[in-house]
Amino acid sequence: MAESIFRKLRDGGEEGELAPALTIEETVASPFGLDVSGYLLTNLSSSILAGKSSSQGLVLITFSRSPSFYLQLLKQKGIVVSSSSKWIRILDCYTDPLGWIDQSSTSFSEGSSLIKLHKCVSDLKKLFSSIIEAGRELVGTGKTRFCVAIDSVNELLRHSAMPLVSGLLTDLRSHAQISSVFWSLNTDLHQEKVTNALEYISTMKANLEPLCPSSDGQRNALENLFSVHQDFGKGRFHVRFKLRKGRVRVMSEEYHVDQSGINFSPISSVDTVIAATKSLLPKVQFNLQLSEKERVEKEKVVLPFEHQDDGKSNEIYDGRRSLVDGKIETTPLSSMELQTDVVSSGKGGEIIYFRDSDDEHPDSDEDPDDDLDI
């Protein structure tokens, strides 16, 4: 499904539509959002160089890692970035996000002409202008488009309020020259309303789920320690696509992180059934299954709506005195006679039902209180 995300970002949106946006959600248990960002970054770079992308340039905004890290990543994948490259620009928000370092003392070695130092990341209007300016250096001011990659919005949310950050991302999607946008987010660092706001802006959401979830509290912590360590770089990669007319498509696959990077593979059928079964069970701390003894005791309980006649034959009164002392009463009694008999017998408070007709079955679904006579 990572390939489907890449194709969406590569192809971009239709003319007049907002640019596709992707949120990559990671957690402390599965902190591989930057690996997914690196996977998309290298694939988009390859497609731009091959002329197979709707965009002709890429603007990378770095918050969590230095620009040299991404230059080295591209180099490892066989993508050489030189000072004469006309397809990529890097906006460095990692080196001096608060503007405390003297610019004269800051130097870049490899690809320094491609890297622009951006200070004071809390000024989002200035950041937006810097992104557009960097993109236009690549594609000009016409209809040619470029894509925008933000390695992490965690640091951006640290310096700016959520409404301002969502406004920046919305403005990027709305710009006519931006073909696609993607960013990563650690959901454990933010409130649920922040995550929901970013998901609302996005047209795609990808979240990483660990193969061995962490145990609650200290229970079974030692038992799961070895399996957690062994399967730390493995897990599930779930993707949700927002389609037209409010439809949603959800897809999943497995991921594995090694020294070469992150790799994706389809989920086996057995694992799919097990995962689907586990997902249907609520996340509770008590056992929902009954033991054999509990099941036997449960069957002994007589519920109020069940017959409690200890094996005797069940007789339903149909309003005509069906059985009295083993003799069948053939002549129906009038309502006045029945009321007289009840009063004379000294019994009060009995409920007597009269059937509307002989065609009505005793177990009819009609409300018997319609003919109630006390």
UniProtKB/Swiss-Prot annotation:
Keywords of this entry: Cytoplasm, Nucleus, tRNA processing
What are the GO cellular component annotations? cytoplasm; elongator holoenzyme complex; nucleus
| Segments for region (Disordered) | 352-374
Q: Which Gene3D superfamilies match?
A: P-loop containing nucleotide triphosphate hydrolases
Q: Which domain of life is it from?
A: Eukaryota
Give the UniProt subcellular location, in the record's own words. Nucleus; Cytoplasm
Q: Which family does the similarity line name? A: Belongs to the ELP5 family.
Q: What is this protein called?
A: Elongator complex protein 5
Q: Which organism is it from?
A: Arabidopsis thaliana
Q: What is the lineage of its organism?
A: Eukaryota, Viridiplantae, Streptophyta, Embryophyta, Tracheophyta
Originating gene: ELP5
